């Protein structure tokens, strides 16, 4: 292959390769209210995301993390500094270990979420329900405190 052909091929790879990187995530969460009105979309980097919040009774920080596996939303793991009301580990559902920052980590839950979506009742701003994927954050409590929202996994591939 001639030097000019190598240069052309290199330029094409740079142009189309960077376009693929800039194309964005393959999945997003579509966030709708109880009347099915679209509130917003939340991009998922590498198909992973977490929901952080403060327990409404004890105020402890809780983190549930999800991943997308072959187009299916799955609960991956949960970090709970304390087993407050409604929290805890159930035999046969993940592995309970100590978390390096304290509390409990329930790892390897790998539980499919039916219908690729879940309903949450968004807490007040002190609860701070927040979606996090890589460096993107969306505080749902600032957006829709007290509302029932549906978080639905959507493929952005067409």
Please annotate each region the language model reported.
Residues 26-89:
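N-terminal secretory signal peptides
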Residues 73-76, 86-158:
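Mature, soluble, non-transmembrane domains
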Residues 1-8:
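Bacterial N-terminal signal peptides that target proteins for export
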Residues 20-25:
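Boundary at the C-terminal end of the N-terminal hydrophobic targeting segment
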Residues 8-16:
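Bacterial N-terminal signal peptides
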């Amino acid at each position: 292959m001639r030097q000019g052909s190598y240069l052309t091929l290199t330029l094409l790879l740079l142009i189309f390769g960077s376009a693929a990187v800039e194309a964005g995530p393959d999945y997003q969460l579509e966030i709708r209210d109880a009347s099915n009105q679209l509130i917003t979309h939340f991009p998922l980097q590498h198909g992973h995301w977490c929901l952080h919040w403060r327990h409404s009774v004890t105020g402890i920080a809780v983190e549930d993390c999800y991943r997308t596996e072959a187009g299916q939303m799955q609960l991956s793991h949960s970090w709970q500094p304390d087993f407050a009301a409604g929290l805890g580990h159930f035999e046969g559902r993940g592995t309970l270990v100590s978390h390096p920052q304290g509390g409990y980590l329930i790892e390897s839950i790998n539980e499919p979420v039916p219908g690729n979506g879940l309903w949450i009742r968004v807490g007040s701003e002190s609860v701070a329900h927040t979606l996090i994927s890589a460096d993107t954050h969306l505080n749902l409590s600032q957006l829709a405190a007290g509302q029932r929202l549906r978080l639905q996994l959507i493929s952005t591939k067409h």
